[in-house]
């Protein structure tokens, strides 16, 4: 399939020094094309903002507008990958390949839940983590 023209616009651009990132809303115009992959978006954003490591770029919450041809979502560009690992939620790190998903069995989840039910208050988090001996 031939590459069709894709236009990327950013709006509400903001530099967040506290979280060491740039954050913005991305509008992608892709007429005659179903959608644009997040990998392609990361690549184009890295060129636009001269980012050395594309792993520090996160794109999420994309919605295609009715009728197609335009999508909107959010983008974050962290100063370093370490900052991204520090501030991003775990599920987003897993999606971007910076972390691995831990597969828990159904039985483990149920046992942890039942141990936590026996304890009240702040100690509940500790009860779910370890078994009593």
From Swiss-Prot:
Annotated segments matching region Disordered: 104-133
Gene Ontology MF term list: mRNA binding; structural constituent of ribosome
Feature: compositional bias, Basic residues: 109-125
Keyword list, A-Z: Ribonucleoprotein, Ribosomal protein
GO BP terms, alphabetized: translation
Keyword Ribosomal protein: yes
Keyword field contains Lipid biosynthesis: no
GO cellular-component term (any): cytosolic small ribosomal subunit
Record-stated family: Belongs to the eukaryotic ribosomal protein eS24 family.
Protein's name in the database: Small ribosomal subunit protein eS24y
Species, as recorded: Arabidopsis thaliana
């Amino acid at each position: 399939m031939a590459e069709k023209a894709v236009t990327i616009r950013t709006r509400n651009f903001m530099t967040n020094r506290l979280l060491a990132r740039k954050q913005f809303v991305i509008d992608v115009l892709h007429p005659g094309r179903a959608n644009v992959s997040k990998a392609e978006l990361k690549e184009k954003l890295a060129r636009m903002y001269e980012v050395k490591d594309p792993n520090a770029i996160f794109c999420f919450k994309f919605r295609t507008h009715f009728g197609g041809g335009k999508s909107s979502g959010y983008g974050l560009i962290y100063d370093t990958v370490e900052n991204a690992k520090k501030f991003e939620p775990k599920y987003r790190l897993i999606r971007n390949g910076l972390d691995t998903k831990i597969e828990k069995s159904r039985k483990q989840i149920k046992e942890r839940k039942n141990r936590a039910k026996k304890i009240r208050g702040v100690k509940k988090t500790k009860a779910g983590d370890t078994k009593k001996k």
